[in-house]
Amino acid sequence: MPDAAKKVYLIHGWGANRHAFDDLMPRLPATWPVSAVDLPGHGDAPFAQPFDIEAAADGIAAQIDTSADILGWSLGGLVALYLAARHPDKVRSLCLTASFARLTAAEDYPEGLAAPALGKMVGAFRTDYAKHIKQFLQLQLLHTPDAAEIIGRILPDLARCGTPQALQEALDAAERADARHLLDKIDVPVLLVFGGKDAITPLRMGEYLHRHLKGSRLVVMEKAAHAPFLSHAEAFAALCRDFVEGGLT
């Protein structure tokens, strides 16, 4: 069990907010002090231009009194990598799900997404966010029996995504970011959880992280897509429990 002085912090992905974890949090041990945070310009968090990944990591570090277990989803996982590299005294472990060290492809990084594919993927969110975040959730939970109940519970709060400018700047920052040089500086236990059907952060991105984060463990949920903690909430929560309590070494 985590020491009472420690906390578990959950960091959401682009275009979401802390309410993305509303269905996961009740499944985690009641003894854990868990905090889900809003990234700058998302949810209720204020936005000071420009959106900066390092500043976002520093802002979360300022909230942490002692070493904490950090779970980051997608963009939140990228922020978590910067947090662990810049503030190693604040991070006890990392759980990264559907995340990346670099989002866009490069000559030396074929694991990334091609620019046209990335533009097509996010374009819909820019035009009608509320409509497409609901469709995104429906797709993620396609084979989940209580999908409608979950979506009905989290969608109203999740749809409070922040200003269009904040979302655009956060996306621009994610496209520019490259944390590959930080990976060998991270010396904490790392759990990587990826969906086998994820087209946004494909498994190859998780495999890259696994190769370059020493001692990491990669778990693939074959039928999950970009939000394993939603589509496979019980299994995901069990992985988190085992990992944080020392079951995965």
Curated annotation (Swiss-Prot):
Function (record text): The physiological role of BioH is to remove the methyl group introduced by BioC when the pimeloyl moiety is complete. It allows to synthesize pimeloyl-ACP via the fatty acid synthetic pathway through the hydrolysis of the ester bonds of pimeloyl-ACP esters.
Gene: bioH
Residues where substrate binds: 14, 74-75, 136-140, 226
Compartments it resides in: Cytoplasm
Active-site residue list: 74 (nucleophile), 198, 226
Pathway listed: Cofactor biosynthesis; biotin biosynthesis
Record-linked HAMAP family: Carboxylester (MF_01260)
Domain AB hydrolase-1: 8-232
Family per record: Belongs to the AB hydrolase superfamily. Carboxylesterase BioH family.
One Pfam assignment: Abhydrolase_1
Protein name (record): Pimeloyl-[acyl-carrier protein] methyl ester esterase
